Amino acid sequence: TGEDALLKRATVLGNFNPRDYMERRVWITARDGERIPVSLVWHRDCPAQDSPMFITGYGAYEISSDPGFSVSRLSMLDRGVLYAVPHIRGGGEMGRAWYEQGRRLNKKHSFEDFVDATRALQKAHLADAWRTVANGGSAGGLLMGAIANMAPECYAGVEADVPFVDALTSILDPDLPLTVTEWDEWGDPLHDPEVYQYMKSYTPYENVPVAVLEGGNDEAAGDGSADGAATGAVAAAQFPRIFITTSMNDTRVLYVEPLKWLARLQSAGVDAVAKIEVEAGHGGLSGRYKQWEEVSYENAWCMDVMGLAH
């Protein structure tokens, strides 16, 4: 019949009422003219108008970031935060061609789509740039490092979970267990000079802007090209706060990657911190209560950046 039938509803403790929350799908136009869908959620009593925003993305491996309910989101939504998910190229939301436009030598489309979605929401006065926090993990952590380098003025904070931020170094080492299979997603920089130069132009670790030092030193660590991840020198005060999570037993993204990135960020004067889990793997802590503690810690940092923790 085409009619929806509710078969089961999870119990949510507290005074949760699903009618208190609004959702909407909007479309923004990326810099190359492509239309990007963005999913939005906010509390009915907190109209999305220059709101603090939590914007999250992934955009890799043809994985779809489908909208879904999460109890952990309620705390921020109830404080007036706009929750946004841009369905950027590199994911699988819009079919195979959508994925192909965000992989290998098209990877920068993923970063540009995310930044363009952020700017569109801010320009429409739905979100406030001074209270916007971006989030992504693993390949989405690479996305976070890239967008922080590309458009630091758009974000007050960036949370990067187990981030793949030194991708070039890792993918150049065929002795690592996942390297050769990852060439299908990112390209093979070991044997293809074009892929090497392309990855070098966007890999977060390679493109951290150097702080404007006393005396006028305004060189950049990256190539500073207009279409790359680096955009030239950025004063540390203009760069978003960075929160990194990593795990000592992560076999997918070795902990040395985010910690190298942390060291380079801090040497550039950026307000960057890391939370290191000794016993966790790529998926974070195991055990329901440990996972809730981890989420609450991350949410507390985000709300502090947004000015909502007081």
Predicted regions and their residues:
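Active-site-proximal cap/loop segments of hydrolase catalytic domains
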Residues: I88-H310
